[in-house]
Amino acid sequence: MQTEEKQMKMSYLIKRFVPYFKKYKWILILDLICASLTTVCELVFPMLVRYITNMGINNIAGLTVGIILKIGLFYLILRIIDSAANFYMADTGHIMGAKIETDMRRDLFAHLETLSHSYFAEHKVGQIMARITSDLFDITEFAHHCPEEFFIAALKIIVSFIILCGVNVPLTVIVFASLPLIFCFVKFFNTRMRKAFKKQRNQIGEINSQVEDTLLGIRVVKSFATEELEAEKFEDGNKKFLDTKKLGYFYMAGFQTSNRAFEGVMYLIVVVAGALFMINGKISPADLTAYLLYVSTLLATLRTIIQFTEQFQRGMTGIERFLEIMDAPAEITEKENADELKNVQGNITFENVGFHYSDDDTNVLSNINLNIKKGDSVALVGPSGGGKTTLCNLIPRFYDVTEGRILIDGKDIKNVTLNSLRNSIGVVQQDVYLFSGTVFENIAYGLSGATREDVINAAKLAGAHEFISNLENGYDTYVGERGVKLSGGQKQRISIARVFLKNPPILILDEATSALDNESEKIVQDSLEKLAKGRTVFTIAHRLTTIRNANMILVLTENGIEEQGTHQELIDKKGLYYNLYSMY
């Protein structure tokens, strides 16, 4: 994401935002028609006052009750039209804004799902959450009011200029000659307000991240009695947010004060210059009255724009932060007309595979060549940082190889669709993630349209049915956020049941039992052995006693594949694997 010092050009933001109106163009057109009606209704009033005043001064006898009632009825009709138009703008216009906000949030979420693991490793979840939720809140008001307010303002300024010129050209030239001054103020303060609002958004994202971090680690916080430390961290972030708010309000105050001063000067110019013109016979009292009313309308329009400026800048800031994610490239993409990976057997080939992360040119893996047959069991062992998890992450294309290629059943995985590739691979991780919901929903997540019978059968295969049946509501038991109501072993068995239900031909076991106690590990290990039957399996192991029966064991270090062979071959070799195994 861009730093707060870098700002997208406003023209670019508007260009990217405008297409969201396309679906709602008729609503927008009607909204602008209604805006035109309200503007006309407002601008007619000074003309009526001018007419009545002129009649009162020059032809009081001609100003009959009938004429007054007709004028009153005419104005009443205008106000009814104005009220109906305002209702449409306030109701349907706001709904249009809300729909645009919804569309943008949908697009943002869809794009987030296309981004690679590296993006989420580099950006805080709290910041992302702020962008997909609070940053788009102001879009509703912005999408509704932005075209409407600027259209009304432009219309009022143009019509007012024409009418005022019709009343008195010299006075109008004086009034409008001073308008560029206000636009200079607008430009000066707008730039600074937008920077301040972006700092606010960034800081609230930091607060979200800090709160999320504390709440997710609340057990650690309580076990170390560090509530005060966390409170201090929160207070520090909260104070920084307050400071950014103060900065924003400082510029807002300067902006509003400057404009109130400008408004006062405008009235002063009209009153003094108008009075001088009047005593010299260059403008009539009725015309000066109407002129003052039009100037009042003009200044009210400018005041509305000024008041809208804060909302405008908040909206532009929200759009900018929205686009910062939308413009993040999806590193893992499908080729056009990619093939479906069908009837997968599970033969996997690594051809001269190398990999390094996008922010570091140092290879994590180099010259990896493997030929794994259907149903083979491959174990990966070695010290941390050797690339075991990275190698496994390349198979479902969580990351893409930077050198060489990987083939499944002879097909380059870059030439097949991501869905068909990932549907062929099941992953059981050490850090199990369960979604908020029931046990049934979490297991059924493994297969779209799974029946209750399917879920129960998968749970039985995973050795989870018995403990699930003993839960208060069985399969309908709510597991809590991230499965907090279940033990580590229970969560792991549910995740294994999920993979049983998916029934993939290729399986990746990423230290699936490393965080479990001995009793839970034995139960889960039995489930994993059932799951592995008939599949091509990659196992990242921390306890080497669990991989003795693997067809192939790879010992990975920072230098690549240090050793390769069966358990007995590596023991006989008395190398690194022998030393690691001897430690258990």
Sequence positions of predicted segments:
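Hydrophobic alpha-helical transmembrane segments of ABC transporter permease domains
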Residues: 33, 41, 45, 85, ...
